[in-house]
Each structure stands twice: as C-alpha cells, then as structure tokens.
C-alpha cells in the first residue's frame, strides 16, 4: 500500500527540545512507526509551520490512503476554528482521490505551554476537532480524532513528545485495522 501523510511539524517529526529544533529519530516518529509496523510504503509530507494550503497538490493516482492532519498552525496564527475548517474544506475539495482513500485526522488539542498561553487556543482546538468531524461527514471521507489517543505534548503545548508519537501511531493503527 502507498500511504501519503500530509501535515505540519507533528507529521514531519519536529523535535522541540533543541534550540534549533530538529527531528526525532525515525523510530520515534509516528509516520515511520506506521511504515515499520505495517510494511507499507509511507511518504512523509509533513512540513514545519504548514498552515492549510489554499489548494491541494496533485497526489499520485496510486495513492491507497491520504492521511491529512492540519489546522494547528492556522489556529496559532489567529484563525477561528470555523475559518480553519473553511480552509480545510477548500483544500480537501481539491483532492482528486476516491473519497474512501482520504482520512482526515483532527489534531490533538493543544495544552498550556510556551506557545499556548491562552485557554482560548485550547478551546479552539477542541472546537476545531468537532468542525473536522462535521466536515469529514459532509465530504464523505474517513475521520479520526487524535484527541482520543492520549498524545503527550512537549513544553510548548503543541508538539508531540516521543511518547506522543508512539501513542499517535498506536491510535492510528487501531483506526486503520
């Protein structure tokens, strides 16, 4: 199976512990754990700082599953959950794969930390997850809520810890079985 994981720094595997950031080792990143556990070909299209693009790239026709997890950076930049969901709707409407091949994952909710000083952002991330679920239903695509997977976040309140990546991979594998 060919899987594409399209997301932000939590898909990329950003390690917030170092001064310049960096990347967790492959055996600690959820995308690579998914590949190792399944034997599937998994492409990591995560990018640090990625907000929801205005248009979707042309994903290859031989893609068996497109996993999309976006929206956290949009909320951090001041978008409301509704605005972020509208961006996501526009993006996903431009994905020309069979709807059964698209899995939208709502990011886990943010927690208080260096990047998250306001309870409003935490509330917005919970609301955004609900918006994602509604959107997935409207578009007829698959949906998972990573907020149910007990993802531990780093000191910044945004990025997964290594344990968070493992928990995410476990939750995703259960979702895909």
Predicted regions and their residues:
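Alpha-helical cap/lid subdomain in secreted, periplasmic
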Residues: 56-177
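Serine-esterase "nucleophile elbow" of acetyl-processing enzymes
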Residues: 1-48, 56-62, 166
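Short histidine/acidic/glycine/proline-rich micro-motifs that form metal-
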Residues: 11, 20-21, 49-50, 73-76, ...
């Amino acid at each position: 199976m060919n899987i594409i994981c399209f997301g932000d720094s939590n898909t990329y595997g950003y390690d917030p512990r170092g001064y310049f950031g960096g990347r967790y080792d492959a055996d600690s990143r959820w995308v690579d754990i998914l590949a190792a556990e399944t034997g599937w070909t998994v492409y990591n299209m995560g990018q640090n700082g990625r907000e929801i693009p205005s248009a979707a790239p042309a994903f290859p026709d031989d893609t068996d599953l497109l996993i999309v997890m976006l929206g956290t950076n949009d909320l951090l930049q001041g978008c409301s959950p509704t605005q972020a969901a509208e961006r996501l709707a526009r993006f996903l409407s431009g994905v020309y794969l069979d709807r059964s091949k698209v899995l939208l994952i709502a990011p886990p909710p943010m927690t208080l930390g260096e990047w998250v000083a306001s309870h409003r952002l935490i509330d917005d991330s919970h609301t955004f997850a609900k918006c994602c679920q509604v959107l997935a239903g409207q578009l007829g695509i698959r949906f998972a809520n990573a907020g149910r997977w007990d993802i531990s976040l780093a000191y910044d309140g945004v990025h997964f810890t290594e344990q968070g990546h493992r928990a995410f991979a476990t939750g995703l594998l259960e979702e895909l079985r």
